[in-house]
């Protein structure tokens, strides 16, 4: 019989199993129907990433912070909407088959959604770096100096999306 070093290890294992099961069901639902519903398609993809974050943190025996969840959600939504924008960019001047849901997206809407999500990720991360909990945990208030790198990374991604056809 396997012995666990933590009394809560079994409950953690069950939580990870439940999350992995939810992830599988979510992917099946996405493949069968949800990928055809505008906006919800990206939220489902982001939910899959969030479930992976939860499974990973619980799997190693730590509770996910609300900052990790907030920043993770905003970043995965940002990337999801940016990906849809890149797919629309690729369709310009090229016919052919594509995701049916793209017919329901508008470039301006996607630009606004990526901007909102990028702003949310930047604000969330910035607030994380100065929160009392974070300063106490890391023993420094200097994490605020990492914010420009996060902003640059997001801006660079947007530049590549809009000027280089990336995404």
What do these predicted regions represent?
Residues 19-30:
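Internal transmembrane alpha-helices of multipass membrane proteins
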Residues 3-11:
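Short, small-residue-biased leader/transition segments that mark boundaries at the very start
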Residues 10, 29-36:
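Short acidic, glycine/Ser/Thr-rich loop/turn "cap" segments at secondary-structure junctions
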Residues 32-35, 43-45, 49-167:
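C-terminal membrane-associated helical module and adjoining short loops/tails
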Residues 10-21, 147-149:
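Structural signature of hydrophobic alpha-helical transmembrane segments
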Residues 14-16, 35-38:
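Membrane-interface helix-loop-helix modules in multi-pass inner-membrane proteins
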Residues 26, 40, 155:
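Single, functionally critical "micro-switch" positions that shape active/binding sites
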Residues 1-2, 142:
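Hydrophobic residues within membrane-embedded alpha helices
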């Amino acid at each position: 019989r396997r012995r666990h070093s933590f009394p809560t290890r079994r409950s953690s294992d069950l939580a990870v199993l439940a999350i992995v099961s939810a992830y599988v069901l979510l992917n099946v639902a996405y493949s069968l129907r949800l990928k055809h519903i505008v906006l919800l398609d990206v939220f489902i993809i982001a939910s899959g990433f969030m479930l992976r974050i939860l499974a990973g943190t619980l799997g190693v025996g730590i509770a996910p912070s609300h900052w990790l969840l907030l920043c993770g959600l905003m970043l995965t939504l940002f990337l999801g909407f940016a990906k849809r924008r890149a797919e629309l960019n690729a369709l310009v001047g090229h016919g052919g088959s594509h995701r049916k849901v793209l017919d329901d997206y508008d470039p301006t809407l996607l630009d606004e959604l990526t901007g909102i999500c990028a702003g949310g990720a930047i604000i969330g991360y910035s607030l994380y770096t100065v929160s009392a909990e974070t300063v106490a945990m890391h023993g420094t208030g200097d994490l605020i100096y990492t914010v420009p790198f996060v902003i640059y990374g997001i801006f660079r991604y947007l530049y590549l999306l809009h000027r280089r056809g990336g995404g």
